[in-house]
């Protein structure tokens, strides 16, 4: 199987806090060289919210996932600070509406603000988009070695094969001992 085909099967790392990977040549570099940087960004949806009876609808941005190792509370605090000093314009309110069903940060926009411009500013001026350094490092014969994805998978398969052989030999030895006892 070719490296290109391998990269279509293994799409990228899965981070526990979610976020979406920006696929470009950097991920292929990580796969082929064993080291590189991956761009990950938070997930933003735009929706219209109703402010109350008789009031106009407004646009809001809903953030449902943050990049790995970004603190939600710290990110909201930093965003509020940027809005207060005027570095990000067009935001009227920021609310954390997270509950047991998942994360939800609602950013209410001002009446005539453009959601696309604000999304662009959020990615540029906050940690909503960040680079994550990746290195495929493994112990091979007791020494740390930087591996490509193909070598990494080959060593993993060798390890699994060895583990299964050891487990099978153990069960065979136990069964042989029981058989010897029963046979007398």
Predicted ranges, named:
Residues 1-184:
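C-terminal interaction appendages of subunits in large macromolecular complexes
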């Amino acid at each position: 199987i070719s490296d290109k085909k391998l990269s279509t099967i293994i799409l990228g790392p899965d981070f526990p806090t979610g976020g979406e990977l920006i696929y470009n040549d950097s991920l292929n570099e990580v796969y082929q060289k064993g080291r590189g940087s991956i761009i990950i960004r938070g997930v933003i949806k735009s929706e219209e919210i109703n402010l109350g009876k008789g009031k106009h609808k407004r646009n809001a941005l809903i953030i449902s996932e943050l990049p790995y190792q970004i603190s939600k509370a710290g990110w909201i605090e930093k965003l509020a600070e940027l809005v207060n000093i005027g570095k990000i314009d067009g935001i009227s309110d920021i609310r954390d509406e997270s509950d047991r069903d998942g994360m939800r940060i609602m950013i209410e926009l001002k009446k005539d603000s453009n959601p696309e411009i604000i999304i662009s500013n959020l990615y540029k001026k906050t940690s909503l988009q960040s680079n994550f350094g990746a290195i495929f490092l493994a112990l091979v014969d007791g020494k740390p070695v930087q591996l490509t994805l193909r070598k990494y998978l080959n060593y993993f398969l060798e390890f699994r094969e060895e583990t299964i052989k050891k487990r099978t030999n153990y069960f065979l030895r136990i069964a042989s001992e029981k058989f010897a006892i029963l046979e007398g």
